[in-house]
């Protein structure tokens, strides 16, 4: 049986850590930043773990 292909869109958006957590970027940080407050853009900075409800679905897309 052939290997399962990973979803290329999901592989660009999510990263799996060594412990198995799935990390994602926050939304609303790409453009029109001049209209957003500095406080908001700082809050949207960095990567955050995915919710447990979505973990299984994303790992299946990543063929893990």
From Swiss-Prot:
<feature type="region of interest" description="Disordered">
    <location>
        <begin position="1"/>
        <end position="22"/>
    </location>
</feature>
<dbReference type="GO" id="GO:0003735">
    <property type="term" value="F:structural constituent of ribosome"/>
</dbReference>
<dbReference type="InterPro" id="IPR018265">
    <property type="entry name" value="Ribosomal_bL35_CS"/>
</dbReference>
<dbReference type="InterPro" id="IPR001706">
    <property type="entry name" value="Ribosomal_bL35"/>
</dbReference>
<dbReference type="Pfam" id="PF01632">
    <property type="entry name" value="Ribosomal_L35p"/>
</dbReference>
<protein>
    <recommendedName>
        <fullName>Large ribosomal subunit protein bL35</fullName>
    </recommendedName>
</protein>
<keyword id="KW-0687">Ribonucleoprotein</keyword>
<comment type="similarity">
    <text>Belongs to the bacterial ribosomal protein bL35 family.</text>
</comment>
<dbReference type="GO" id="GO:0022625">
    <property type="term" value="C:cytosolic large ribosomal subunit"/>
</dbReference>
<dbReference type="InterPro" id="IPR037229">
    <property type="entry name" value="Ribosomal_bL35_sf"/>
</dbReference>
<feature type="compositionally biased region" description="Basic residues">
    <location>
        <begin position="1"/>
        <end position="15"/>
    </location>
</feature>
<dbReference type="GO" id="GO:0006412">
    <property type="term" value="P:translation"/>
</dbReference>
<dbReference type="InterPro" id="IPR021137">
    <property type="entry name" value="Ribosomal_bL35-like"/>
</dbReference>
<keyword id="KW-0689">Ribosomal protein</keyword>
């Amino acid at each position: 049986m052939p290997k399962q292909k990973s979803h290329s869109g999901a592989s660009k958006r999510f990263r799996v850590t060594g412990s198995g957590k799935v990390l994602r970027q926050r939304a609303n940080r790409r453009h029109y930043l001049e209209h957003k407050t500095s406080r908001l853009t700082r809050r949207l900075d960095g990567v955050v773990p995915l919710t447990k409800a979505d973990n299984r679905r994303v790992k299946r897309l990543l063929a893990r």
